[in-house]
Amino acid sequence: MDRPELAGVHPADGHPDHPRLAPPYIERDADTVLRQAVHENGFVLIVGESTAGKTRLAYEVARSCFPRYAFVRPMARPALAHAIQVAKRCRRAVLWLDDLENYLGVDGVTTSALAELIQRRPGRVVVLATMRSQEVRRYEAREESRLTGSDRDAWRVQREVLHMAAQVQLERRWSVGEQDRAEAHKADPRIGLALTSCDRFGLAEVVAAGPELLAAWQNAWAPGANPRGAAIVAAAVDCRRSGLRRPVSRQWLQDFHLPYLAERGGPDLQPEPFDEAMRWACTAAYATSGLLIGNYSQGYVAFDYLLNAPQLLPVPDHLWDALLSQAEPVDAYDMGLLAHQSNRLEQATAALERAWQGGVSGADFLLAIAVGDRGRPREAARALEGVMRRRRAQLGPHHPDTLASVHQWAFFIGEAGDAETAATAFGELVAAATAALGAGHADTLAARHQQAYFTGEAGDTEAAVQQLTALLSDRTELEGPDHPQVLAGRRSLIWFSSLTGDLAAAEQQLRQLVVDAQRALAAEDPHMLAIRSTQADFIARAGRAHEATGLFTQLATERSNLLGRDHPHALHTRLQRVQGLMSTGGHEQARQELDQIVEDAQRVLEPGHHHLSFAHHLLSQLQLP
């Protein structure tokens, strides 16, 4: 194969003398690393930003290293299973998974399928994949909706696929060495032009016309320009940002773009006819990918460079709701997974409900988690009890998916108020996970953390401290001192130690943890927010009410902005702020805020939720003379 665009490389503006000729390949700094990786590993993933040159790098290395191998590229997720069978039948094959995120999810790639393909014929089959950095970050170890290590079950299959791959990072901005190598090809006008912009953009980014296409979209909103085309592109971009992994039909774009156009001014923008708008969006005056890629029969997707445009607003409800109403159950699962990862829990439950009703495998499990995370732990535990029963019958008691369902069931049993049962269940799970997965497996370590947490919540603080001390030692050795789970373990240990020990000493330990966490975590990271919340709680317990109230006020704002005002974490922090207001004499302000919090909480939390109990306790205190 001698045409890189057939492998998924973004087309470049045509050469004036040879319009179909691709730009010359310029060796990247990552070239040597990738060559070594493909010879040492059966599965290699190249990670970088849109238009960084990931696909071209993979294509050139594959052609060089595997010239006699068959090239097997499934064009969409439904074709993946057949592509794997084709790769198995070939004497030698490269399985090509450009934009790996499109092959993750229901009926998508799994570690077992890849392992069977690679291990049965070592060296005969190589899996080469690419993925945008933004997509990879969705699956990094993090816990948005809980802080003791179990959210990973919601997207374990996808994360395990990424962990199976040897990852090679590719920078978007070109190094001095890469620019020097490009100088040898500056006679090609496309390379010459790109070299003049390397102070702001990557060379491959310019060759693919990424900045020009983005500017064309932004400028098209002007009255009399192409405002309808811009609205169509906005709808297509947000379809991808909502989690849709397949092309959108022309009819969908015709329906979905109307609110975008209306929000910008509607008729005042002098919008062009729809057919003209579609032609503009697909050609965009550049001989590259266009703002939309596709055609009438196959559907359309937005150029992925646009997904990282600066200052994109959140996906509007009108698009999300309209898309979900039209989506197939499999699409709804993808949308629900992304919504859950993004803490849009109301949207997650709606999408996963649709997927579950449509019979999508695994939707029952993820739906139960989303329901519980939204503040209905008893309902989640009841649903997970059924999931556990089915998985034990179908997969056996020691299968990782069965153990994951036990983990989630035990967690929500504890969240519903039965900490003692949860601690016992996690103790049994630790033994089962150790036997089935190993003592150092992430699931085993997560179960140990939960066992310690609920042991402490059940009242045995001393045992919780002992368990957390042992866990922290093991995690630090396995994962290093800056791993988010190590930092989370330190926070839990400091908290439970403070309940029976010296509060001043615990506060000093927490101050050091804040310093360490700031070095390793982003300011909005959930672990960082949890550490700051514990710090504010210590300050309140030490009697510095005004200082604590100020910290809780800041945290309430940040968590509400990040998660939504009615997320359980945000509700709890808002209640802590009210408690601070009460302790500093702001009773009238506290009463007003508490009334609003109770209204918000009753809308999303199940009756008897511990946040509601806390709110009613504060209300009763405010009513005392």
Where are these regions (language model features)?
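Phosphate-binding P-loop
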Residues: L34-N41
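C-terminal leucine-rich, beta-strand-based interaction scaffolds used for sensing/assembly
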Residues: A235, C239-E353, G358
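Conserved P-loop NTPase "ATPase switch" module shared by AAA+ and STAND
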Residues: R73-A76, V86-T110, L114, V126-E135
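Sensor-1/coupling segment of RecA-like P-loop NTPase cores
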Residues: I118-R152
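Conserved small helical "lid"/interfacial subdomain of P-loop NTPases
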Residues: R152-L203
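Charged, amphipathic alpha-helical interface modules that flank catalytic cores or transmembrane segments
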Residues: M1-D29, V33, E60
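Intrinsic-disorder-linked linear interaction elements in eukaryotic regulatory proteins
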Residues: Y333-P625
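Walker A/P-loop nucleotide-binding motif
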Residues: N41-L57
